[in-house]
């Protein structure tokens, strides 16, 4: 079926001669001058059928059959004048067929004539009549459909018609032009011209909005619009084919269409659009600042936005706000004369408005005149609470233990300066004896203490004040959980110590026993019962000596535990240091007559010899602390009850004792030796003194700010000191930095019992009566310009509280990231990583 397209043009066509094979002009009769209606322009070929039949076919098909246009066939345009059927014969038909053959060869020549109509020389005379009829036509658009190559048309002229044939080609410029009076038919496909585009044209796969994974196991990806399978092409390529595709010069602009399983090459416009989006620019051709003018013609109901403005927000609020009511009140008061305004103004106000000032006045004089004294109200006294009542609740009254703790507490740290008491009636209440003193202190505060106002600063992000610390997970290994419990003691375990090789653990308890445990198996291999509670135990830090020192009551005993068999199996160094007779010690003994050395011998000491007890050292007072020198030949003891001579240094190989300090304001509590230098640390209740043993002089004093020191320890490198106190403080000192603490850590809720450094790893820990063991990462750098790094790692809390006592002692394993702890619950616990 031939599909044709009818257009209307009001342009006068140019006439040109078409050469055919016979080189004969086409015979065309002169058209009649009287034309009742304009002729139509259509693309068709006139057949030999009668005119009446042609008219019937045209009218019937125009009203019933919809026109289907073929986008692939080019449209033709024919101009019809008055057709003369008398001059039409069979010879002309043969000539016409020969001309059709020539038209195929000359098609390119016809199209290159800018869409103009080609006529022969004999048609020049009728050109004027035809063009005139075309210009007068108002409805020149006729769309029809013919079933064969020859179409039939009937003109609506009352006069006789004349037959003529004219073959034309419509160019691209003519296709773009659309008649203003074009009439559309009921054909649903009439709008889909070759120039139209839609989003569905590129969509070949018509499976709909379903997951494409459903087609992974098939050889096709879906179906087209006709229901045919779309076989996989691009997705079936292997790596070699994909590599060869990179040779394509347009590979960099080729994208893969997953739905249609094909590759799409992006055009220059697409690349420009993507580049604009990437650079956050507007798309090409878009003007964001184009001028806008609305004439009002676009609104069919003649409603202009100026007359149909949106409702303002103020209409949703109640009539009259507080500010409006206040303004109305003041306005009425001024109008009625109730409020009188000072129209004259203050003196100097005019100069201020003009910007003038006294050039020769003293500097600051103007400010003093205008600056007033800002009065700050006196702070109000705190209102009395339930604890100050004459009949307070039972929970506010102190029991015996709380009363003792209240008396031992510093007055500045007490929650209140009186002891709550309970009376049955108000008449039994005595006179408050501190009333005059409190009133006097109140008066002193009012006229002597400066007053200030605190401005609360709002901080959006309080975390910015915190230091940037590494994550604990990046600082492993460190002890993180409880692994083993050593059970055997019946009372609180006051002290524990680990051997230099990390194989044996010694412990001393209030049940008057000394036990040695094997760390790997938790078996108790040695047990010794003494006369009183064990205060301290300490292994010799030198691994060549198998010596354990134990302090209980006023005695120090030196033990060589029979862990390796009989005494003869001990190392010769151990036997040598214990059996060497004292030499040149007469002067030292004269200086320390209060300290006596005894060799354990005889039948009465047979049980002690079997247990490995070799030497006994008797002191005048109870020994609380014992520490070894790193070489293992010296150790020091501390007896706080002795006063000025509380610190003593013992020489094991010479069996000698000396008191280096003769005067002391406060009793000494703890002593420590430097790990690799002849430096001695002595701590009293609130100050740590550092002495040089070679020069016998004081090097420096460390100001702790602590009220009662309980424990100190020295870093393995010797340049840092850590201290713990009964006032819940832990202080880190950098000896190269200052005599004051580098860091003060207040994280324990009760008294700190022990602080220690790890011998080999950058770890330190502290234990307290609050049942917690805090493990920290403490890195000390060789660079003196870089401060130590302190990072909290883990809080271990597994002990139980007995009589308000918690963890009493802790010690690190010499090689592993393990920590041992002993508590008032008579248990020893091992924490591992």
Swiss-Prot record:
Region described as Disordered: 20-202, 568-592
GO terms, molecular function: ribonucleoprotein complex binding
The keyword rRNA-binding is annotated on this UniProt entry: no
Superkingdom: Eukaryota
Species per Swiss-Prot/TrEMBL record: Dictyostelium discoideum
Bias type Low complexity, positions: 36-56, 154-170
InterPro entries associated with the record: BOP1/Erb1 (IPR028598), BOP1_N_dom (IPR012953), WD40/YVTN_repeat-like_dom_sf (IPR015943), WD40_repeat_CS (IPR019775), WD40_repeat_dom_sf (IPR036322), WD40_rpt (IPR001680)
Keyword entries, A-Z: Nucleus, Repeat, Ribosome biogenesis, rRNA processing, WD repeat
Name of protein: Ribosome biogenesis protein BOP1 homolog
WD repeat start-end pairs: 331-370, 488-527, 529-569, 618-660, 663-701, 704-743, 747-786, 802-833
Annotated PANTHER family: RIBOSOME BIOGENESIS PROTEIN BOP1 (PTHR17605:SF0), RIBOSOME BIOGENESIS PROTEIN BOP1 BLOCK OF PROLIFERATION 1 PROTEIN (PTHR17605)
């Amino acid at each position: 079926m031939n599909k044709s397209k009818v257009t209307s043009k009001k342009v006068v066509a140019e006439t040109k001669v078409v050469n055919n094979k016979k080189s004969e002009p086409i015979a065309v009769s002169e058209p009649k001058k009287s034309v009742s209606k304009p002729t139509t322009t259509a693309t068709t070929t006139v057949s030999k059928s009668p005119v009446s039949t042609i008219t019937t076919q045209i009218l019937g098909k125009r009203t019933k059959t919809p026109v289907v246009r073929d986008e692939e066939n080019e449209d033709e345009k024919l101009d019809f004048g008055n057709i003369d059927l008398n001059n039409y014969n069979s010879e002309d038909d043969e000539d016409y067929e020969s001309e059709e053959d020539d038209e195929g060869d000359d098609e390119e020549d016809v199209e290159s004539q800018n869409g103009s109509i080609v006529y022969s020389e004999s048609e020049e005379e009728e050109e004027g009549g035809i063009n005139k009829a075309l210009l007068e036509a108002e409805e020149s658009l006729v769309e029809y459909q013919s079933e064969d190559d020859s179409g039939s048309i009937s003109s609506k002229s009352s006069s006789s018609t004349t037959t003529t044939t004219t073959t034309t080609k419509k160019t691209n410029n003519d296709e773009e032009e659309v008649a203003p009076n074009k009439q559309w038919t009921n054909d649903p496909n009439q709008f889909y011209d070759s120039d139209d585009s839609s989003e569905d044209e590129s969509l070949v796969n018509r499976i709909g909005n379903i997951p494409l994974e459903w087609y992974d196991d098939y050889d096709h990806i879906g179906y087209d619009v006709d229901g045919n399978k779309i076989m996989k092409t691009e997705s079936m390529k292997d790596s070699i084919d994909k590599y060869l595709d990179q040779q394509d010069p347009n590979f960099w602009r080729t994208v893969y269409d997953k739905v249609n399983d094909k590759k799409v090459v992006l055009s220059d416009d697409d690349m420009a659009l993507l580049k604009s989006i990437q650079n956050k620019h507007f798309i090409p051709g878009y003007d964001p600042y184009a001028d806008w003018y609305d004439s009002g013609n676009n609104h069919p109901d003649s409603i202009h936005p100026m007359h149909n403005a949106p409702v303002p927000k103020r209409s949703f609020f109640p009539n009259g706000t507080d500010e409006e009511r206040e303004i109305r009140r003041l306005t009425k008061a001024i109008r009625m004369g109730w409020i009188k305004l000072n129209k004259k103004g203050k003196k100097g106000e005019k100069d201020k408005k003009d910007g003038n000032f006294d050039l020769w006045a003293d500097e600051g004089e103007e400010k003093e005149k205008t600056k007033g004294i800002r009065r700050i109200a006196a702070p109000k006294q705190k209102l009395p609470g339930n604890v100050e009542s004459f009949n307070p609740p039972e929970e506010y009254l102190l029991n015996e233990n709380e009363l003792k703790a209240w008396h031992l507490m510093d007055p500045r740290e007490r929650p209140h300066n009186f002891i709550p008491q309970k009376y049955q009636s108000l008449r039994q209440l005595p006179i408050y004896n501190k009333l005059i003193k409190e009133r006097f202190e109140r008066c002193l505060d009012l006229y002597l203490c400066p007053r200030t106002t605190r401005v609360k600063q709002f901080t959006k992000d309080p975390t910015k004040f915190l230091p940037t610390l590494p994550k604990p997970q990046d600082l492993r290994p460190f002890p993180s959980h409880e692994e083993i419990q050593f059970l055997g003691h019946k009372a609180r375990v006051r002290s524990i110590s680990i051997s230099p090789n990390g194989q044996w653990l010694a412990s001393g308890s209030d049940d008057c026993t000394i036990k040695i445990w094997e760390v790997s198996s938790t078996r108790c291999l040695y047990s010794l019962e003494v006369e009183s509670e064990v205060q301290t135990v300490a292994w010799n830090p030198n691994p060549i000596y198998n010596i354990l020192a134990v302090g209980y009551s006023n005695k120090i005993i030196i033990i060589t535990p029979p862990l390796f068999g009989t005494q003869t199996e001990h190392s010769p160094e151990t036997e040598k240091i214990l059996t060497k007779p004292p030499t040149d010690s007469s002067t030292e003994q004269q200086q320390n007559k209060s300290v006596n050395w005894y060799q354990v011998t005889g039948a009465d000491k047979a049980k002690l010899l079997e247990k490995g007890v070799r030497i006994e050292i008797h002191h005048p007072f109870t020994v609380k602390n014992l520490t070894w020198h790193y070489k293992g030949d010296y150790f020091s003891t501390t007896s706080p009850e002795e006063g000025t001579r509380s610190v003593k240094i013992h020489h094991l190989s010479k069996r000698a004792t000396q008191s280096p300090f003769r005067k002391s304001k406060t009793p000494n509590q703890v002593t420590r030796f430097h790990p690799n230098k002849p430096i001695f640390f002595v701590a009293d209740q609130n100050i740590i003194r550092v002495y040089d043993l070679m020069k016998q002089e004081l090097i420096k004093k460390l100001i702790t700010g602590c009220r009662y020191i309980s424990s100190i320890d020295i870093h393995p490198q010797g340049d840092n000191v850590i201290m713990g106190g009964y006032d819940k403080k832990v202080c880190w000192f950098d000896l190269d930095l200052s005599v004051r603490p580098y860091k003060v850590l207040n994280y324990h809720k009760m008294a700190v019992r022990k602080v220690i450094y790890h011998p080999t790893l950058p770890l330190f820990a502290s234990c307290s009566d609050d049942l917690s063991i805090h493990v920290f990462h403490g890195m000390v750098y060789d660079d003196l310009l870089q401060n130590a790094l302190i990072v909290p790692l883990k809080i271990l809390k597994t002990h139980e509280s007995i009589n308000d006592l918690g963890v009493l002692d802790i010690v690190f394993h010499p090689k592993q990231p393990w920590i041992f702890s002993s508590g008032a619950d008579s248990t020893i616990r091992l924490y591992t990583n």
